[in-house]
């Protein structure tokens, strides 16, 4: 019965596709200078076209939500809509761009997401079995390991801003619990070695901090 069952996909018309693209909001998740235009593929490295990517990235560099329609209008004389959509799709596939909810949707879920995230960060002080934080921006869950969650607490509650301070903060939590870092499959026993490894991880956390902030995980 064709009134109940339809064979194959019911595809959107080009006008519907364009309309839905225009309504979508997007947000860059990495600092502008950290986004490279080299793409690793099965066939080797591919250089992305700077004449398309650079103007889009410049508009997204503030790490704030932007409607695709806004980007399209701003780039009307430089980037065609189909090329803009391709740029956004590639950045999203590289996890450098998020599809975000509108402001009303974010406000509706923000308090619950933040309460959940605070519970998880507090739990991370003694237990690292759940590596998940919720983003009010996207409405989704993002994998965040135990140590980044611990660093988040040091950054938020203690205003620790450099890798050495964050490493000391994490070590003061891990050491009394008898927990040690590992390097090359070996458990590190010396305090200096543990702190050295924690500093490396803290530096990686600070590099990721703009992403966490854009997703409202911190």
Segments (PLM) and residue ranges:
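Rossmann-like AdoMet/SAM-dependent catalytic core
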Residues: 1-61, 65-218
